[in-house]
Regions:
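Sequence termini and other peripheral, non-core segments
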Residues: 1-29, 33, 42, 78
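Short, charged cytosolic
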Residues: 19-26, 35-63
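Short, charged/polar, low-complexity loop and linker segments
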Residues: 34-39, 107, 127-136, 178-186, ...
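Solvent-exposed, non-transmembrane helices and loops of integral membrane proteins
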Residues: 45, 143-188
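Alpha-helical transmembrane segments and their immediate juxtamembrane boundary regions
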Residues: 64-140
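Cytosol-/stroma-facing membrane-proximal "stalk/adaptor" domains immediately downstream
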Residues: 207-250
Length: 250
């Protein structure tokens, strides 16, 4: 084992070991496509089928974005490097001029102190400018990832709205319907499948979001992905409570 392999054991060159330690987008997208077909076959006129169809399109776009964010944005990186080199060259030129014009004596020492103060200020400014230029690429990737995660979060809330009125107690106890009660046409088996489909969409939604955490090394993106996973877990928990009520009632 070389020094770099010891220092970075999970770096590049570990592709053969990532079959079961890295999320692969292909199987996830295939699962979403099959889930869309299953919902269309069982509930062709339902709003959930339209939600899953839109979610499939969003998942394909998000997967492509997550894959692209893994690569460097070369135009931005090249411009940032050139700008950083230009700033560095300007500071070096200023230091050379200071050294060339320096002379011994009281006036020269006073001029040296004043010039040194200016050089320190320029170095601080240059450091901030270089940090800004270097972080442009990361901030662009963060903005794109957060925008996609916002759409994935919206899908989760929409799925929750579709299962909101799916009350399992109608198959357990006798309840008198009112004029404002939502229309409930699903029998016990259909309601179980409907709720299960909602749970699957939420789980796959979190897996698509996890692709951004896997491909973008950014704390803000990782926090947003974790928040989305917690949201989908909580919504799935409510759905499975309804499924358990149906199972216990039977």
């Amino acid at each position: 084992m070389t020094f770099w392999e010891w220092l970075f054991p999970f770096g590049r060159g570990q592709e053969n070991m990532e079959r079961y330690t890295e999320l692969r987008s292909g199987p996830i997208l295939n699962t979403i496509a099959r889930l869309e077909q299953r919902i269309m076959e069982r509930f062709p006129e339902s709003g959930l089928s339209k939600v899953c169809k839109e979610f499939h399109v969003l998942a394909v776009r998000s997967e492509l974005l997550a894959r692209n964010l893994r690569k460097p944005i070369w135009p931005v990186r090249i411009i940032a490097i050139l700008a950083a080199l230009l700033l560095t060259g300007l500071v070096i030129f200023a230091v050379q001029q200071l050294v060339a014009n320096f002379s011994l004596g009281s006036e020269g020492m006073l001029q040296l102190l004043q010039s040194a103060e200016s050089v320190v200020n320029e170095l601080i400014f240059m450091g901030l400018a270089i940090y800004f230029l270097v972080s442009i690429e990361a901030r662009l990737k963060r903005h794109s990832a957060l925008k996609a995660l916002h759409h994935l979060r919206s899908i989760a809330h929409i799925v929750d709205m579709h299962q909101l009125t799916k009350d399992p107690t109608q198959h357990v106890v006798s309840i008198v319907q009112t004029q404002s009660s939502p229309e409930r046409k699903l029998n016990r088996a259909e309601l179980t499948r409907y709720l299960d489909y909602c749970s699957e969409i939420l789980s796959l939604d979190a897996k698509i979001a996890a692709l951004f955490a896997q491909n973008v090394d950014d704390e803000v993106v990782l926090t947003a992905v974790n928040d989305l996973e917690l949201l989908t877990q909580g919504l799935c928990g409510k759905i499975w409570q309804k499924i358990m009520i149906l199972d216990l009632g039977e």
